[in-house]
Curated annotation (Swiss-Prot):
Function noted in UniProt: NDH shuttles electrons from NAD(P)H:plastoquinone, via FMN and iron-sulfur (Fe-S) centers, to quinones in the photosynthetic chain and possibly in a chloroplast respiratory chain. The immediate electron acceptor for the enzyme in this species is believed to be plastoquinone. Couples the redox reaction to proton translocation, and thus conserves the redox energy in a proton gradient.
Protein name, entry field: NAD(P)H-quinone oxidoreductase subunit 5, chloroplastic
Entry-linked Gene3D superfamilies: 1.20.5.2700
Segments passing through the bilayer: 9-29, 40-60, 89-109, 125-145, 147-167, 185-205, 219-239, 258-278, 284-304, 327-347, 354-374, 396-416, 425-445, 549-569, 605-625, 721-741
Main location, first listed in the record: plastid
Organism of origin: Guizotia abyssinica
Length: 741
């Protein structure tokens, strides 16, 4: 056991050789390195698998045992200041290490096929391996300085991966936005770290908690300053976990490849956002106001993220806002002091969300054969629908992930979310009402995403790519508040082009196909991808390859069974409680971590009823019951029937506007913050050029002018000098005379 802990420092550095060797290989032997590129994927998976096995071994040893701090080396700046580096192995570290490695392995295996066509394949795996190193280093850190170092490396890797396709202007802007927004939180984190070092004189967690507790209990510290430093520390977590109001980078981050979206939402945002708050819980608990502030930010984010997800057209952005809301639940639980519930939901949500993102990637991958390699088309749920027959494995896996996130038993998120919802009643009835209402919204928007993606008919054959509706019937999620336009009954279907290798588009003749006893006239969507030698033609999407389906199937198992780790029927079965011993729980301080069947069933029936209500509303609005009507037009909502529908239309349009405009937060920042900073910069530039530079420039110009005048006067004649001399004397005498009158 001691030997295992002795070598635990190697955990973050095991994946590091891959990016280093890829970089050296591309620099010294580029052709050979590129030709053996699949080998690097295998090495990435192998090294991360070793880390996973090592982490699991540590986790087993951590059950009912104390945490281990190991000093490695120190960097001595001077006699009074030195930085110590080591690692901390405790239940929190074990949980995060297993989560990062398991999700990371699934994403790497998935990416091997998903990114196989991409010229940046090697670069992607180099970034991913370095990303894993950064996250593992973050969760094993023993002090605030190490956390900050690896925190910045996580931010750098996020920047590189979000902007992976940097030749696309949208992706380049997205990674810049993510970088700048996170810099706000990072600056707050740095100030908070320096503030607590000034108070306690230590960066080490164990010393920091003990010293601060003694200072506060003896009333030897400025409480306002301590609270300010704690808020600054929390600001870093707000930015990294996309909590309100520093969440604006999250939807734009979907411009990166789908596998990295899965890793960011399942592992990174909890490793770099929720983890620091959980790690610093002993510090925050002695500052009651900061706990209230954490729970307030959490409940705002819970509701805000759910409302923004209600009418998204992009499948990945809908899931992104879902992550924002679910991380809000975790932050709410931490703010309430329900440490176990927060970490339980962290685990269950991670695997469910990874399953959903990899499932969405499979859908996007299959849609690209029809609409081309353009995210605005392949990720647009307007063009999806009817995929059940074409991608059945992806459909079933996505359905399981959806039901898990909705809170349907016995799937993973049901067990963890229920604990948070029940604890919220003990903390604040107002917060509880918001949290329970948002649970219904979660079921609604997740079921909506599923229905628009997999049910009905494939809409790419019936809608143009601009998303304009072709009938006077509409849905708030698809067509928004656009005015009704009566379309021509003999409308022409979307024209699909084939891009030849010479880049010239060519039209293909119409052919008649039979779908569900309805004869429709389609243009066969032959597609060939330039430079990849693809000669296959596709009329419908097809299921992904086994390399992509294998991680999805493994994540299905996690989604089905990981929730049983924390079922609190009795203390012997509750593995999670044993794992987290000792655990912080301010709401159940005298609890023995077990509940009776009656209490559990009563709470479960209520939460499941709310989830089913949200699912029912989604089916009522988005189930395409009219899809067999003329032209197989997709109708997801009600038929307009005159003035009675005006009020409901306004509500739908308001919801759509709120979601489409991202809650107007981006517009607010653009109007007041960005525009204000630009005006301040313009004023500063004017003041600097005209005032600061103007004064010395003016003095110089005046001196030059006076010198030129004097120069022109001096002609070398004594009579001229005498004339000017007596003239000036006379002027001064007159001035003196008038002043003494």
């Amino acid at each position: 056991m001691e030997q295992t802990y002795q070598y635990a420092w190697i955990i973050p550095f095991l994946p590091l050789p891959v990016p280093m060797l890829i970089g050296l290989g591309l620099l010294l032997f580029p052709t050979a390195t590129k030709s053996l590129r699949r080998m690097w994927a295998f090495q990435s998976v192998l090294l991360l698998s070793i880390v996973m096995i090592f982490s699991m071994n540590l986790s087993i040893q951590q059950i009912n045992s104390s945490s281990v701090y190991q000093y490695v080396w120190s960097w001595i700046i001077n006699n009074d200041f030195s930085l110590e580096f080591g690692y901390l192995i405790d239940p929190l570290t074990s949980i995060m290490s297993i989560l990062i490695t398991t999700v990371g392995i699934m994403v790497l295996i998935y990416s091997d096929n998903y990114m196989s066509h991409d010229h940046g394949y090697l670069r992607f795996f180099a970034y991913m391996s370095f990303f894993s190193t950064s996250m593992l280093g973050l969760v094993t850190s023993s002090n605030l300085i190490q956390i900050y170092i690896f925190w910045e490396l996580v931010g750098m890797c996020s920047y590189l991966l979000i902007g992976f396709w940097f030749t696309r202007p949208v992706a380049a802007k997205a990674c810049q936005k993510a970088f700048v927004t996170n810099r706000v939180g990072d600056f707050g984190l740095l100030l908070g770290i320096l503030g607590f070092y000034w108070i306690t004189g230590s960066f080490e967690f164990r010393d920091l908690f003990q010293i601060l507790n003694n200072l506060i209990s003896n009333n030897e510290v400025n409480f306002v300053f301590v609270t300010l430093c704690a808020i600054l520390l929390f600001a870093g977590a707000i930015a990294k976990s996309a909590q309100f109001p520093l969440h604006v980078w999250l939807p734009d981050a979907m411009e990166g490849p789908t596998p990295i979206s899965a890793l960011i939402h399942a592992a990174t945002m909890v490793a770099a956002g929720i983890f620091p708050v959980a790690r610093l819980m002993p510090l925050f608990i002695v500052i009651p106001h900061i706990m209230n502030f954490i729970s307030l930010i959490g409940i705002i984010t819970v509701f805000f993220g759910a409302t923004l997800a209600l009418a998204q057209k992009d499948i990945k952005r809908g899931l992104a806002y879902s992550t924002m809301s679910q991380l809000g639940y975790m932050m709410l639980a931490l703010g309430m002091g329900s440490y176990r519930s927060a970490l339980f939901h962290l685990i269950t949500h991670a695997y469910s969300k990874a399953l959903l993102f990899l499932g969405s990637g499979s859908v996007i991958h299959s849609m690209e054969t029809l609409v081309g390699y353009c995210p605005k088309k392949s990720q647009n749920m307007v063009l999806m629908g009817g995929l059940t027959k074409h991608v059945p494995i992806t459909k079933n896996s996505f359905l399981l992930g959806t039901l898990s996130l909705c809170g349907i038993p016995p799937l993973a998120c049901f067990w963890s979310k229920d604990e948070i919802l029940n604890d919220s009643w003990l903390y604040s009835p107002i917060f509880a009402i918001i949290a329970w209402s948002t649970a219904g919204l979660t079921a609604f928007y997740m079921c909506r995403i599923y229905l628009l993606t997999f049910e009905g008919h494939l809409n790419v054959h019936f809608q143009n790519y601009s998303g304009k509706r072709t009938t006077p019937l509409y849905s708030i999620s698809l067509w928004g508040k656009e005015g009704s336009k009566i379309s021509n009954k003999n409308f022409r279907l979307v024209t699909l082009l084939k891009m030849k290798k010479n880049g010239r588009p060519s039209f293909f003749s119409n052919k008649v196909y039979k779908m569900d006893e309805n004869v429709i006239n389609l243009i066969q969507p032959f597609l060939s991808i330039p430079n990849f030698g693809n000669t296959k033609t596709y009329l419908y999407p097809y299921e992904s390859d086994n390399t992509m389906l294998f991680p999805i199937l493994i994540l299905i198992l996690f989604t089905l069974f990981v929730g049983f780790l924390g079922i609190p029927f009795n203390q012997d079965v509750d593995i999670l409680s044993k794992w987290l011993t000792p655990s912080i729980n301010l709401l159940h301080q005298n609890s023995n971590n077990s509940i009776d069947w009656y209490e559990f069933c009563k709470d479960a029936v209520f939460s499941v009823s709310i989830a089913f209500f949200g699912i029912f509303i989604a089916f009522f609005l988005y189930k395409p019951v009219y899809s067999s009507f003329q032209n197989l037009d997709l109708i997801n909502s009600f038929v307009k029937m005159g003035p009675k529908r005006i009020f409901s239309d306004k509500i739908k349009n308001a919801i759509y506007d709120w979601s489409y405009n991202r809650g107007y937060v981006d517009a607010f920042y653009g109007t007041f913050l960005t525009a204000g900073v630009r005006k301040l910069a313009e004023f500063t530039h004017f003041f600097d050029r005209r005032i600061i530079d103007g004064i010395p420039n003016g003095v110089g110009f005046l001196s030059f002018f006076v010198a030129e005048v004097i120069k022109s006067v001096g002609g070398g004649r004594i009579s001229s000098y005498l004339f000017f001399y007596f003239s000036y004397v006379s002027i001064f005498l007159l001035i003196y005379y008038f002043l003494n009158l």
